[in-house]
């Protein structure tokens, strides 16, 4: 049996500790390398939403995104063609990997420019949304497309061209579906926006909810005054005595609020093309129907809304 003096034993122990630590660091290094590879995996594999921007060439939109489902970037180009007067967009054409695929007429939509969005729920489900805007930035065209490999065409899976939908752009996407921002300017409250979820089923998008607590006032964004501070908090000051109702479409009174009091916008319900807003006053909740055609501007519901209406 080998015998060691104290110095030799100390050296052996130190060397053993060094080798053990080196092995630990090697294992840790391998783990970190593998982890880095995981997080550096191309984003094409993940659900995502992004803009396809307009290039320096006016009327052309270019993006490199996965359309065909192979998790590699495809070249997508949307080219617009103006009308004879040069005011509106007459049509747009979609090119995929250098090949012309689909042409859509915008002759009846009075669009000045486009917004192009890309949304990916999964490898199998990728979409292009094209939004056309006209006067006062109103949405006049809005459709979502997916690519069909067999026909080499982009086909519509959701049309928001019914203006009573109030839909604008896709804001999120995941394996379950998409979330779409909506926006409208009721005369009673001014501009508000909200989001609603859609699921993808049988090759089309279906809205899965009619109510949301995401509704927000936009009136506090452009001015700096005391009313802007209220609007930024979703609060409205009554301009007269206002009656709120217990349910949507109901005539049963929940409560009445005197002039000059603050109520808080809490919820939106969209039912049968009608918009109802839920407000909170103290500990009470009540509803108003808004966006009515016969609104009386001379007797507004809320203070300082009329002066902020656009269009």
PLM feature segments, named:
Residues 2-19:
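Short, Lys/Arg-enriched N-terminal segments with co-localized hydrophobic residues
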Residues 65-73, 119-125:
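Residues in Ca2+-coordinating acidic/glycine-rich loops
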Residues 220-276, 280-286, 291-311:
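Beta-loop motif signature
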Residues 112-147, 153-232:
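Short aromatic loop motif centered on NTY/YTY
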Residues 20-31:
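Bacterial N-terminal signal peptides that target proteins for export
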Residues 29-40:
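Bacterial N-terminal signal peptides
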Residues 74-78, 129:
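Structural core positions within WD40/WD-like beta-propeller blades
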Residues 38-51:
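Sec-dependent signal peptide cleavage junction
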């Amino acid at each position: 049996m080998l015998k060691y003096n104290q110095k030799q034993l100390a050296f052996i122990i130190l060397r053993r500790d060094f080798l053990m630590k080196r092995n630990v660091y090697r294992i840790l290094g391998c783990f970190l390398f593998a982890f880095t590879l995981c997080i550096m995996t191309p984003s094409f594999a993940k659900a995502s939403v992004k803009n396809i921007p307009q290039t320096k060439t006016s009327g052309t939109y270019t993006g490199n995104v996965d359309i065909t489902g192979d998790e590699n970037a495809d070249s997508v180009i949307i080219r617009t063609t103006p009308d004879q007067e040069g005011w509106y967009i007459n049509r747009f054409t979609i090119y995929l990997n250098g090949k012309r695929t689909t042409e859509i007429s915008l002759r009846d939509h009075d669009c000045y420019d486009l917004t192009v969005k890309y949304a990916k729920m999964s490898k199998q489900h990728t979409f292009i949304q094209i939004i056309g805007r006209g006067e006062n930035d109103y949405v006049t065209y809005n459709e979502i497309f997916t690519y069909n490999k067999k026909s080499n065409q982009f086909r519509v899976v959701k049309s928001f061209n019914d203006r009573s939908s109030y839909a604008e752009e896709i804001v999120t996407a995941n394996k379950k579906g998409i979330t779409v921002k909506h926006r409208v300017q009721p005369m009673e409250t001014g501009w508000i926006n909200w989001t609603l979820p859609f699921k993808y089923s049988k090759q089309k998008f279906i809205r899965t909810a009619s109510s949301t607590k995401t509704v927000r006032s936009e009136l506090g964004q452009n001015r700096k005054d005391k009313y802007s501070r209220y609007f930024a908090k979703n609060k409205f000051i009554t301009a007269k005595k206002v009656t709120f109702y217990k349910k949507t479409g109901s005539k049963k009174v929940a409560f009445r609020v005197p002039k000059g009091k603050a109520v808080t916008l809490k919820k939106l319900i969209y039912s049968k093309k009608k918009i109802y807003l839920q407000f909170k006053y103290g500990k009470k909740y009540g509803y108003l129907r808004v966006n009515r055609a016969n609104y009386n501007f001379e007797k507004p519901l809320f203070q300082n809304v009329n002066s902020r209406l656009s269009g």
